[in-house]
Amino acid sequence: MTEQSIKDGQRPELPPFTLRNVLNDIYNGILALFTDPFCTRIICPVVIVLTSLLSKAIIYKVPYTEIDFRTYIQQIQIINDGELDYSLVQGDTGQIVYPAGFVQIYQVLNWLTDEGTDIHAGQTAFGYLLALTNFLVIIAYTMTPDFQPWPVYCLLLSKRLFSIYVLRLFNDCFTTVCMVSVTILLQQAAYWYKKGGSSISFLLTMVAADLYSIAISIKMNALLYFPGFIIVAYFLCGENLLKFGTVLLVIPIVQVLMGWKFLLPFFNDEEASYIRWNYINQAFNFNRKFLYKWTVNWRFVSEEFFLSDVFSNGLLIANASVLIFFIFTRYISPRITCKPVSRLIKDAMVGPFSSTINKNNLLIDPKCGPKLVMLILGSTNIIGILFARSLHYQFLSWYCWQLPFMLYMTGWSLLVCIPLWVVHEWCWNVFPSTPMSSGLLVSILAIVLFGVWYNTNEWFPKLADNEAATIDESGESKKDK
């Protein structure tokens, strides 16, 4: 039937009602639930509800496993009794090693669980925390235009992740929800830079810095995001060093406020200095050693090599090298910033208190910016995970929420991404870890990072109105040549 006949009100001709056509419709419907961006809005609320229901089912069916929660509560009770010296705050499994944000969160959990006696209340709270986290993750995902549904399903498929939340009650979960929120705030800042003005973007970036510092005060793994955070924040401040410095200043100020009772900033006597030093030394200890028996990612190296300084320093150098490579080939590429690196440096030195950002910078483009924020923060974090000194089982929560997105950003087929996800999940469910599970885990993370880096279509999409066509590789305008 012609288009004109449809406009005239006539019913379109339907395909014949046959078994083959019915099966074909069913197949297309199922395929759409995985690949049609329109279906993303349908399945998102379903996934959030299922997260909550699965958490409740696991709490009901699977016995709780005590690992560190009792120790956390014991430490909080000592602090609640008035102890400020971190060296004297300890529980069954050791001394307190987390900053003051951890203390404040677990003080609430101490009250909620009636000093640790009502574990079910704590499990329920963590179940809702997981549902909230997935809700926020979906918001972050769907700020990428035409986002397919299949990565959202992956949020339901990690047995280990559900265990970390509702059967272990680790503090890592709170850092994660903070970092997802930071990501959303920066995505919103990128989206509104042109639509709502740079002032709105600056305020959102300030709030993101506040929340980022809170995440660090819960657990220091949030520092893995720092290189990506400062790059994104710099551009969202319009390359204005005054605004950028203000954003960075928020981070230490929040740390001081969070740890006020342990830092004792208005006291300079010997006892106050001792308490202050013990807090800083234990809460922000970068020299902490890890036990080989708990490593998930380096079981394929010998224990002697694992514990050596050579291995530790090698990982640090590798981390820095890969990160620098990503920074110069992707994060601040002229194809994103629309100006060469030399011009970025010159603008920062010549006009530090003015906005020098190129209007075509992809990070402030409403369509491209939110996706690039997710890409930069996600790749920065996973680079840190790949070269981490050691990963323990609860550390999966640090990046599990980003992995489906990163797989999607490789541009690979669903038939490649899903098997990679399944094998990755298997690696985290092998206990104790084996050389094979560790080797596969490291390999998958490296492969995903390479795939994300290699897929230039996601990093350097064609700009609307062909604006990108006027910018060459050096960042200079072709029209000016």
Curated annotation (Swiss-Prot):
One CC-aspect GO term: endoplasmic reticulum membrane
Q: Which domain of life is it from?
A: Eukaryota
Q: How does it sit in the membrane?
A: Multi-pass membrane protein
Q: In which pathway does it act?
A: Protein modification; protein glycosylation
Cystines in this chain:
none
Q: Does the keyword Endoplasmic reticulum apply?
A: yes
What keywords were assigned to this record?
Answer: Endoplasmic reticulum, Glycosyltransferase, Membrane, Transferase, Transmembrane, Transmembrane helix
Membrane side Cytoplasmic: residue ranges: 63-124, 194-197, 243-246, 330-367, 424-433
Single Gene Ontology BP annotation: dolichol-linked oligosaccharide biosynthetic process
Looking at the UniProt entry, the stretches that span the membrane are 42-62, 125-145, 173-193, 198-218, 222-242, 247-267, 309-329, 368-388, 403-423, 434-454
Q: Which reaction does it catalyse?
A: an alpha-D-Man-(1->2)-alpha-D-Man-(1->2)-alpha-D-Man-(1->3)-[alpha-D-Man-(1->6)]-beta-D-Man-(1->4)-beta-D-GlcNAc-(1->4)-alpha-D-GlcNAc-diphospho-di-trans,poly-cis-dolichol + a di-trans,poly-cis-dolichyl beta-D-mannosyl phosphate = an alpha-D-Man-(1->2)-alpha-D-Man-(1->2)-alpha-D-Man-(1->3)-[alpha-D-Man-(1->3)-alpha-D-Man-(1->6)]-beta-D-Man-(1->4)-beta-D-GlcNAc-(1->4)-alpha-D-GlcNAc-diphospho-di-trans,poly-cis-dolichol + a di-trans,poly-cis-dolichyl phosphate + H(+)
**Cell location:** Endoplasmic reticulum membrane
Q: Please name the GO terms that the record assigns under molecular function.
A: dol-P-Man:Man(5)GlcNAc(2)-PP-Dol alpha-1,3-mannosyltransferase activity
Which residue spans belong to the Lumenal compartment?
1-41, 146-172, 219-221, 268-308, 389-402, 455-481
Give the UniProt family note: Belongs to the glycosyltransferase ALG3 family.
Q: By what name is this protein known?
A: Dol-P-Man:Man(5)GlcNAc(2)-PP-Dol alpha-1,3-mannosyltransferase
Q: Which organism is it from?
A: Debaryomyces hansenii (strain ATCC 36239 / CBS 767 / BCRC 21394 / JCM 1990 / NBRC 0083 / IGC 2968) (Yeast)
